[in-house]
């Protein structure tokens, strides 16, 4: 019987190679499994991130909708003659009087202040300076400049207001402390800023100084020195050298968030120009004149409106402004207004100064204006006495 050949025993090297091969295959399997698990985890993370982003966008849309409901749809304008500064006895008192008017208008959320010349002097810009009592029109210029200075946030004044004689005593003025006058670390969705003169990369927006520790990079390229309203992004990267934001209309804080965002200042050469040069397409749809000869303000039933105007007279009342206006052929100022009201019946003083009349009248009118201004304006609605 032939002997079977015996298997040659494998050497230690071959056995070692077989063991290493098994280990390598096992290792590859584990690595493949880890890679698959990692891929699944990344996919889950992407899905989670997308869900969080969708949820964040939904929350932002809900917040925006809530803000739009909280917004104030109407505007309030005040017109007064610049000649009231002529009654002040010194430059310091003239400056302080202008500050009182600015404070009164800010307290009652006035959106526009119109300074008109009741003597009919043609003054349409703030160029020039006040040269003393008796100079026609120059009091309007000084009043407008001080009003603009006070409305501007403190961190922007150096950029927009160089040294000027009209602002010589601005240091005695009380600050307005309105919502757009913010501290450096104060958090807010909106901020006022000035475009800085600094080069940026092609396709990138300009840099804006908003009074914060970092400048804000906006979405548009704008000319340096321009004052803008910026809406800051909710998500900011702490390690980034700048904040991110978007340029929006200066009306957005009022219409979308219900914030009072200061006032604009307009000069009018006469009383009729207050109406004729209105910045709104259809003008003012509610006009109110104030006088001691007017009807009781309590009896006035205000209609719904979008743009209201309240007009105050000077030392001689609105009658003097009507007489001096070459464009008006009426003697009774009440025909110019939807309502001609007396806001302080049974007054104890023979005269009420204009700065006092602003506070008294706006306090009397505010409840009615707030109530009817929040309703949508009807094209058929008209004044009701």
Curated annotation (Swiss-Prot):
It comes from the Eukaryota. SUPFAM superfamilies: alpha/beta knot, Nucleic acid-binding proteins. It catalyses: uridine in 28S rRNA + S-adenosyl-L-methionine = N(3)-methyluridine in 28S rRNA + S-adenosyl-L-homocysteine + H(+). Residues 1-35, 47-72 are annotated as: Disordered. Residues 15-35, 47-58 have a biased composition (Basic and acidic residues). Its EC number is 2.1.1.-. CDD domains: HsC9orf114-like. It is an enzyme of class 2 (transferase). One of its GO terms (molecular function) is rRNA (uridine-N3-)-methyltransferase activity. S-adenosyl-L-methionine binds at residues 293, 313, 342-343. Pfam families: Methyltrn_RNA_3. The keyword Protein transport does not apply. It is found in: Cytoplasm, Cytoskeleton, Spindle; Chromosome, Centromere, Kinetochore; Cytoplasm, Cytoskeleton, Microtubule organizing center, Centrosome. Keywords: Cell cycle, Cell division, Centromere, Chromosome, Cytoplasm, Cytoskeleton, Kinetochore, Methyltransferase, Mitosis, rRNA processing, S-adenosyl-L-methionine, Transferase. GO terms for cellular component: cytoplasm; kinetochore; mitotic spindle; spindle pole centrosome. One of its GO terms (biological process) is rRNA base methylation. Its main location: cytoplasm. PANTHER family: CLASS IV SAM-BINDING METHYLTRANSFERASE-RELATED, METHYLTRANSFERASE C9ORF114-RELATED. Belongs to the class IV-like SAM-binding methyltransferase superfamily. Interacts with INCA1. S-adenosyl-L-methionine-dependent methyltransferase that specifically methylates the N3 position of a uridine in 28S rRNA. Required for association of the centrosomes with the poles of the bipolar mitotic spindle during metaphase. Also involved in chromosome alignment. May promote centrosome maturation probably by recruiting A-kinase anchor protein AKAP9 to centrosomes in early mitosis. Binds specifically to miRNA MIR145 hairpin, regulates MIR145 expression at a postranscriptional level. This is 28S rRNA (uridine-N(3))-methyltransferase.
């Amino acid at each position: 019987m032939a002997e079977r050949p015996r298997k040659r025993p494998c050497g230690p090297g071959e056995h070692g190679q077989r063991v290493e091969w098994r280990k390598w295959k096992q290792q590859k399997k584990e690595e493949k499994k880890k890679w698959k698990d990692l891929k699944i985890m990344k996919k889950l993370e992407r899905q989670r991130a997308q869900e969080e982003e969708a949820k964040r966008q939904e929350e932002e849309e809900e917040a925006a909708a809530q803000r739009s409901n909280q917004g104030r749809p109407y505007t309030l304008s005040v017109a007064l003659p610049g000649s009231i500064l002529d009654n002040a006895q010194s430059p310091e008192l003239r400056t302080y009087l202008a500050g009182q008017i600015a404070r009164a208008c800010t307290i009652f959320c006035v959106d526009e202040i119109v300074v008109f010349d009741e003597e009919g002097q043609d003054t349409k810009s703030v160029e020039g300076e006040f040269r003393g009592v008796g100079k026609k029109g120059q009091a309007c210029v000084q009043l407008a400049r001080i009003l603009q200075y006070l409305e501007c946030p403190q961190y922007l004044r150096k950029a927009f207001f160089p040294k000027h004689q009209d602002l010589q005593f601005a240091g005695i003025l009380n600050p307005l402390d309105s919502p757009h006058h913010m501290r450096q670390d104060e958090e807010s969705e909106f901020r006022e800023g000035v475009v800085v003169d600094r080069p940026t990369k092609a396709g990138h927006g300009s840099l804006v100084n908003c009074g914060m520790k970092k400048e804000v990079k906006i979405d548009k390229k704008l000319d340096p020195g321009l004052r803008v309203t910026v809406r800051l992004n909710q998500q900011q990267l702490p390690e980034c050298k700048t904040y991110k934001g978007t340029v929006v209309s200066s009306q957005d804080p009022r219409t979308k968030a219900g914030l009072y965002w200061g006032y604009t200042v307009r000069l009018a050469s006469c009383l009729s120009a207050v109406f004729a040069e209105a910045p709104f397409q259809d003008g003012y749809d509610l006009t109110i004149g104030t006088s001691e000869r007017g009807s009781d303000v309590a009896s006035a039933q205000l209609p719904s409106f979008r743009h209201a105007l309240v007009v105050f007279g000077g030392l001689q009342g609105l009658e003097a402004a009507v007489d001096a206006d070459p464009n008006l052929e009426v003697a009774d100022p009440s025909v110019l207004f939807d309502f001609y009201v007396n806001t302080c019946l049974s007054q104890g003083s023979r005269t009420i100064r204009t700065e006092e009349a602003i506070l008294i009248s706006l306090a009397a009118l505010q409840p009615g204006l707030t109530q009817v201004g929040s309703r949508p304006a009807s094209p058929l609605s008209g004044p009701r006495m």
